[in-house]
């Protein structure tokens, strides 16, 4: 069965695992998911992730979720741009998430990055998701 929104699936898996208090969550691996996980780890929303290889060429990401005194660090994670409704933002119109306490993850011509990094590099792009 093919998946129409692999990134949306990963975001939902992370959200559901955090709501259940899980320490780890597994999601199928892809380049886009890896780049988004790099940003989440860099910004301190997850502890990290590892790629797990299986025979036959299949691989998964095992994501270590982060908690602060028992409460999930990720309070809100949502998909913004979907396959049926793409959302783009220039540097001037880029929204802040909870007055700068959260981040937006963007796909730009210079790669996947947070809204803070995109403003520093003066590039806009597709708003993939918001995290707080």
Curated annotation (Swiss-Prot):
An annotated GO BP: translation
Record keywords, A-Z: Ribonucleoprotein, Ribosomal protein, RNA-binding, rRNA-binding
InterPro entries: Ribosomal_uS8, Ribosomal_uS8_CS, Ribosomal_uS8_sf
Pfam families xref list: Ribosomal_S8
MF (Gene Ontology): rRNA binding; structural constituent of ribosome
Gene3D superfamilies: 3.30.1370.30, 3.30.1490.10
Signal peptide: none
Top-level taxon: Bacteria
Function: One of the primary rRNA binding proteins, it binds directly to 16S rRNA central domain where it helps coordinate assembly of the platform of the 30S subunit.
PANTHER family named in the record: 40S RIBOSOMAL PROTEIN S15A (PTHR11758)
Family membership: Belongs to the universal ribosomal protein uS8 family.
Protein name: Small ribosomal subunit protein uS8
Species the sequence originates in: Parvibaculum lavamentivorans (strain DS-1 / DSM 13023 / NCIMB 13966)
């Amino acid at each position: 069965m093919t998946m129409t929104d692999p990134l949306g699936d990963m975001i939902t898996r992370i959200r559901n695992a955090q709501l259940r208090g899980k320490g780890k969550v597994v999601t199928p691996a892809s380049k886009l998911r890896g780049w988004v996980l790099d940003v989440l780890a860099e910004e301190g929303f997850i502890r990290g992730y590892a790629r797990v290889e299986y025979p036959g060429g299949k691989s998964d990401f095992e994501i270590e979720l982060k908690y602060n005194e028992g409460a999930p660090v990720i309070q809100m994670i949502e998909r913004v741009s979907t396959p049926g409704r793409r959302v783009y933002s220039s540097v001037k119109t880029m929204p802040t998430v909870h007055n700068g306490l959260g981040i937006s993850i963007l796909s730009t011509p210079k790669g996947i990055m947070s809204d803070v990094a995109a403003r520093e590099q003066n590039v806009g792009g597709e708003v993939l998701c918001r995290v707080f």
